[in-house]
UniProtKB/Swiss-Prot annotation:
Organism: Streptomyces lividans
Pathway: Lipid metabolism; fatty acid biosynthesis
Organism superkingdom: Bacteria
Catalytic residues as annotated in Swiss-Prot or TrEMBL: 121, 257, 288
Identification of the protein by name: Beta-ketoacyl-[acyl-carrier-protein] synthase III
Gene assigned in the entry: fabH
Assembly behavior: Homodimer.
Keyword Lipid biosynthesis carried by entry: yes
Family: Belongs to the thiolase-like superfamily. FabH family.
Length: 339
């Protein structure tokens, strides 16, 4: 019986990154006009000073396309060269057709396949691992990864416990072939005992049947999520380094999920991240954008020129599930004309 013929395996890396940040920047002072709080309390507890909130015309598709165009330009890849589009989002209310198809079509990537995934704050790292596998297996040459979120659509702005944390935005990356390993193995995991720690207040079908339950909105046990992040995410980050053959001292950058700066600082401390490593603190003026947060932070880091192209970085996303995913990667060179 004949066997299957498969392409020769190769290496992959991130060729380019891009992002889109909504026009409207909302300060803590403005947030305090809709919740009973103070600017000082919010910044002290979270490190967040402002966040971006999308206007009605800044849909998840619009933001995703804009981020993708910047990533394609940075990578020097034409949309027609994209073989696969993977979109991560938890805030797409149109479940069919797939958002990936709409984004690919608007970009002119009509030769591509595409699908969406939903893994909350870990979504971008999951999507990047799929892209790397697709390139390394020979199934695709160029893969576009997009993470796009309107978190303000799924929160109650009057909820004093979490409305100040979240923002909107999109990030993207183009993955392609490489002469050397450029994306490390993904480390992923779940803790189903934490299902109730970060969840929706009700389902949409419950809301349709009985509007008195209220529009579905995020509910979070912040203390439980914080304890889990320290207990589970830190070992996962160490494992992601180990399987890539790196130590924390080898890194030039650390790009964690931008939950808030307090959690980031604890992760940095527990991991023993040296002072020479640049740590992304994008949440300070972007807020928590769920799956888009790592992508947004990565784009800002690369375009800042603060780290060398080709240097190793560690990314890890974590949140609802509870779940996490992370990997090491070699950073792309900054764009020749930073924007």
């Amino acid at each position: 019986m004949p066997g299957l013929r498969v392409p020769e395996r190769r290496f992959s890396r991130v060729l380019g990154v891009g992002s889109y940040r909504p026009r409207r920047e909302v300060s803590n002072k403005e947030v305090c006009t809709w919740i009973d709080s103070t600017e000082e309390w919010i910044e002290t507890r979270t490190g967040i000073r402002s966040r971006r909130i999308a206007e009605p015309d800044e849909t998840i598709q619009v933001m995703g396309v804009a981020a993708s165009r910047r990533a394609l330009e940075h990578a020097g890849v034409d949309p027609a060269e994209i073989d696969l589009v993977v979109v991560s989002t938890m805030t797409n209310f149109v479940h069919t057709p797939p958002l990936s198809v709409a984004i690919a079509h608007e970009l002119g990537a009509d030769n591509a396949g595409g699908f969406d995934l939903s893994a909350a704050c870990a979504g971008f790292c999951h999507a990047l691992s799929i892209a790397a596998d697709a390139v390394e297996s020979g199934g695709s040459r160029h893969v576009l990864v997009v993470a796009t979120e309107r978190m303000t659509d799924v929160i109650d702005l009057a909820d004093r416990s979490l409305s100040f944390l979240f923002g909107d935005g999109a990030g993207a990356a183009v993955v392609g072939p490489s002469d050397v390993p450029g994306i490390g193995p993904v480390v992923r995991g779940i803790d189903g005992t934490g299902l109730g720690s970060l969840h929706m207040s009700s389902s949409w079908d419950q809301y349709v049947e009985d509007p008195s339950v209220g529009r579905p909105a995020l509910v979070m046990d912040g203390k439980r999520v914080f304890r889990w992040a320290v207990a589970d995410v830190v070992p996962a980050a160490r494992e992601a380094l180990e399987v890539a053959g790196l130590t924390v001292g080898d890194l030039v950058a650390f790009v964690p999920h931008q939950a808030n700066l307090r959690i980031i600082d604890v992760l940095v401390d527990r991991l023993g991240v040296p002072e020479h490593v640049v740590v992304s603190r994008d949440a300070e003026d972007t807020g928590n954008t769920s799956s888009a947060s790592v992508a947004l932070a990565l784009d800002r880091l690369v375009r800042s020129g603060a780290v060398p192209g080709g240097g190793p970085a560690l990314m890890i996303g974590f949140g609802a599930g509870l779940s996490y995913a992370g990997q090491a990667l070699l950073l792309p060179d900054p764009p020749s004309t930073p924007a």
